[in-house]
A protein has these predicted regions:
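Sec-dependent signal peptide recognition
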Residues: 2-10
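C-terminal motif of bacterial Sec signal peptides marking the signal peptidase cleavage site
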Residues: 15-18
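Bacterial lipoprotein signal-peptidase II cleavage site
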Residues: 20-28
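Active-site beta->alpha N-cap acidic-glycine motif
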Residues: 63-139
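Hydrophobic faces of well-ordered beta-strands that scaffold small-molecule active sites
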Residues: 76-81, 99-105, 124-130, 169-173, ...
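Catalytic beta/alpha-barrel core
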Residues: 79-83, 102-108, 150, 172-182, ...
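Alpha-helical scaffold elements lining the catalytic groove of polysaccharide deacetylases
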Residues: 141-163, 179-185, 212-250
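C-terminal domain-boundary segment and adjacent tail
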Residues: 193-206, 265-299
Length: 299
């Protein structure tokens, strides 16, 4: 009996450990689990043959999509989140992407300023990837915008983040399902970003975002993420699904906004494949600065 109890306790502990590592979604399927926004460690260096190997687009090209080049699809904006931690060859390889692809850089990290300088040097626009309070227990960083903060404290923090990447042209939220749902917080955020001459891209980690209402009250144009490219994974099946989903934006005037992440070379390879396929299908990329010009005035 004692042995049976021990085995049952061990099974229960293993089950609890497995559950602890999981993170719940904030909303419907189109909203990302916030662990997707958690920086990971830099992957080990790989040899040159692996790094520069050709892309296998066979599966992506073979699929019969529900749209074609003749359809009236808007251009795409691609933003890569979570720069600031990775460095070395992986970072350099991300800069080899088309210049229209933008880098969203986390503040207060070892490679924050180096990533901002390298992005600027290689022609990529920079966004401040502002850490914000999530609903769950994920850690957004040492300093982040949270519910209950005074407007002056929010302004000071945003100014400090901006000083680390003064070439930034916009900002988007890192995590933030709690903070972006708070009207007073987002009003203070948008007011300060306006003072800094930056526009805001809502990463849409919650379906209860207060950004539209706060922006409307201020007469401030904002953008919203449409697609997370690397959710749930970086497989060809996922990429095909994302490309297929572009068809629902036929006839829309505003560009399609796509976010992915820089954590691993697998994500870089998937992004390269996605760009190669949609380019072959006639879609164009534009940088976030051109996105802003195409945004509709707030309602």
């Amino acid at each position: 009996l004692e042995k049976t109890v021990s085995i049952l306790l061990l099974i229960a502990l293993l089950f609890l450990a497995a559950c602890k590592g999981k993170s719940a979604k904030d909303g419907p399927e189109e909203y990302s689990p916030e662990y997707q926004e958690t920086p990971s460690t830099e992957e080990p260096a790989q040899n040159d043959s692996s790094r520069h190997s050709g892309l296998d687009l066979k599966e992506l090209k073979a699929y019969q999509y529900n749209w074609s080049e003749s359809d009236d699809l808007p251009p795409l904006v691609i933003v890569i989140d979570d720069f600031g931690q990775i460095s070395g060859q992986l970072l350099e390889d991300f800069t080899a992407l088309p210049q229209e692809v933008a880098f969203a850089i986390l503040p207060d990290l070892p490679n924050t300023q180096a990533a901002a300088r390298l992005a600027d040097k290689t022609g990529h626009e920079v966004l401040i990837h502002v850490p914000m309070q999530p609903l769950g227990n994920d850690n957004p960083g040492k300093r982040y915008i949270k519910k209950g903060m005074e407007a002056a404290d929010i302004a000071d923090l945003l100014q400090e983040f901006y000083s680390q990447m003064p070439n930034a042209i916009a900002a988007n939220n890192h995590m933030g399902s709690a903070a972006t749902a708070d009207y007073s917080v987002m009003q203070a955020v948008l007011e300060e970003l306006h003072e800094l001459g930056l526009f805001f891209l809502d990463s849409a980690t919650t379906n209860k975002s207060a950004v539209p209402s706060a922006a409307s009250a201020l007469g401030y144009k904002t953008a919203k993420r449409d697609i997370f490219l690397d959710v749930p994974d970086n497989s060809d099946a996922t990429l095909i699904g994302k490309i297929q989903s572009l068809g629902k934006y036929k006839g829309r005037n505003e560009p399609i906004v796509i976010i992915t992440h820089c954590h691993t070379r697998e994500k870089l390879n998937a992004l390269n494949k996605f760009i190669a396929q949609i380019s072959d299908m006639g879609l164009k990329l534009i940088p976030p600065s051109k996105l802003y010009k195409k945004l509709s005035p707030p309602a």
